[in-house]
Amino acid sequence: MVWNRSLAETDPEIARAIALEITRQGAKLELIASENFVSRAVLEAQGSVLTNKYAEGYPGARYYGGCEYVDIVESVAIRRAKEIFGAGHANVQPHSGAQANMAAYFAFLEPGDTIMGMRLAHGGHLTHGAKINFSGRYFRYVPYGVEEETGRIDYDRMHAIAREHRPKLIVGGASAYPRELDFARMRAIADDVGALLMIDMAHIAGLIAAGLHMSPVPYADVVTTTTHKTLRGPRGGMILCPEEYAAAIDKAVFPGIQGGPLMHVIAAKAVALGEAQRPEFKTYQEQIVKNARALAQALQERGFELVAGGTDTHLILVDLRNKGLTGAVAEDLLDRVDVTVNKNMVPFDPQPPRVTSGIRIGTPAVTTRGMKEDSMVQIAEVISLTLDHPEEGAVQARAKAIVAELCAAHPFLKL
């Protein structure tokens, strides 16, 4: 029967695409800040028979029978999340960070309520109030942003905007902001205007788990995150909150916006959270930051302008206007030499979102492969050779050769 055959036997077209993707991930430098490589254990959990099990509800209160073992899995994930982040309650069921944000909004807001979020072009996220997203359609969105001179969040201006508009909820967090976020300052602003504070820590969850970035948990009414990126787990979402909001959050997730949870993904989340509790995880996170700073410095030495002047995290935002390139062109040029980045808007960007004036770079994936500061200098050289000499084939070939050497010296997970 079909169900007892291998993937290669059943669907060679899909099997080939997966095989090619394995090759791509191993042969290219992954510098997209939101991407990482999970462990073999996480892959095994996500590819397990738990994908067969429906489990609407929560541990001990399911709408289906036969949930005794998935209850164990989800309970372990919840316990580990609470231990790592010091939270009173954790919901590990959101299928994504976007759905975690949606559930948080629905737990505390009504349609038409005012939310404040970081402007998308200044480093915010679609789900923080962008007009093209559900968050900008269902709620009245008021943006805050960064100072043009420094590229850093203007907290005084943020406070003034909050006093003017009196939002019901302020959203902190970003998808393209390289500096540490001041959650204590955000809490003070929220308290002054009587607003709830929601922090989306998706990009920096791993750094926070390792104690390398201020934790939002003591300051926020609700914290959302993805479970991949720096946390190095499966693609998914999670919500943390004080115990007093547990019932509202759980109800907003199920039955509010989701039905059955993805138990195989929750198992993978549990495994990744277990990995995050080990001493080597902190060492890994420390190396992510060291690598980001080394790469930032090496890029600056080669004439690249960095938004906010550098980085405190895993992420670097490069403004390419002084190079005469758009983000879209740079992304394509780098892909040709086997370096993967994403085009990204920079603050006060004159280019449209599909073009942009910048690229976003992150170090989590290359750090997972074991690369350190010396490799970051080589990566900066590759970027410089590629973007400063786009029409010179010999230079491009040299850049591609450096990438091949780096990838060979730091092998991808063997599957």
UniProtKB/Swiss-Prot annotation:
Question: Where is the site Plays an important role in substrate specificity?
Answer: H228
Q: Any idea where this protein resides?
A: Cytoplasm
Sorted alphabetically, the keyword list is: Amino-acid biosynthesis, Cytoplasm, One-carbon metabolism, Pyridoxal phosphate, Transferase
Q: Which domain of life is it from?
A: Bacteria
Q: In which pathway does it act?
A: One-carbon metabolism; tetrahydrofolate interconversion; Amino-acid biosynthesis; glycine biosynthesis; glycine from L-serine: step 1/1
A GO MF term: pyridoxal phosphate binding
Which cofactors must be present for this protein to function? Answer: pyridoxal 5'-phosphate
Q: What is its EC number?
A: 2.1.2.1
Q: Which residues carry this modification: N6-(pyridoxal phosphate)lysine?
A: K229
**How does this polypeptide assemble, per the annotation?**
Homodimer.
Protein name according to UniProt = Serine hydroxymethyltransferase
Q: Which organism is it from?
A: Desulforudis audaxviator (strain MP104C)
